[in-house]
């Protein structure tokens, strides 16, 4: 009985450590946000872009285009366009985040002198003190 309880407690501790890792939590948040973002992009394409594009396409709504015996080429093309829009927006977001990180790192690097500069300043103060004596 004790060994079962010990294994159960060990399992629970391992599971808790796994869940509390930053990567797992971040991944869960990313999946949830990604699902919501998918709805936004689908609405953007379906409700804003396609009503502008459909009049230019002979036959109207291209998402319902079928080739041969049921090959839904329009639906596939729509999924590809949705993917490209999502990928492009994510690229822009990641690029903006990276630019912000670089600026932040530059500010931190400029604010903190490196070790050699600190040592040089300390040596100069020591030399000034010795000269003053």
Swiss-Prot record:
Keywords: Cell inner membrane, Cell membrane, Ion channel, Ion transport, Membrane, Transmembrane, Transmembrane helix, Transport. InterPro entries: MS_channel, MSC/AndL, MscL_channel. Gene3D superfamilies: Large-conductance mechanosensitive channel, MscL, domain 1. The chain crosses the membrane at residues 17-37, 73-93. One of its GO terms (molecular function) is mechanosensitive monoatomic ion channel activity. One of its GO terms (cellular component) is plasma membrane. SUPFAM superfamilies: Gated mechanosensitive channel (SSF81330). It is found in: Cell inner membrane. Its main location: membrane. It is a multi-pass membrane protein. It comes from the Bacteria. Homopentamer. PANTHER family: LARGE-CONDUCTANCE MECHANOSENSITIVE CHANNEL, MECHANOSENSITIVE CHANNEL MSCL. Channel that opens in response to stretch forces in the membrane lipid bilayer. May participate in the regulation of osmotic pressure changes within the cell. This is Large-conductance mechanosensitive channel. The gene is mscL.
């Amino acid at each position: 009985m004790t060994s079962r309880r010990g294994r159960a407690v060990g399992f629970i501790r391992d599971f808790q450590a796994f869940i509390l890792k930053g990567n797992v939590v971040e991944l869960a948040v990313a999946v949830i946000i990604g699902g919501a973002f998918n709805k936004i992009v689908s609405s953007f394409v379906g409700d804003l872009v396609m009503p502008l594009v459909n009049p230019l396409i002979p036959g109207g709504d291209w998402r319902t285009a079928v080739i041969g015996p049921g090959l839904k080429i329009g639906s596939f093309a729509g999924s590809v366009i949705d993917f490209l829009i999502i990928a492009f927006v994510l690229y822009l977001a990641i690029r903006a985040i990276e630019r912000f990180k670089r600026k932040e790192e530059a500010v931190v690097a400029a604010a903190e002198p490196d070790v050699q500069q600190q040592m040089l300043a300390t040596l100069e103060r020591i030399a000034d003190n010795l000269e003053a004596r």
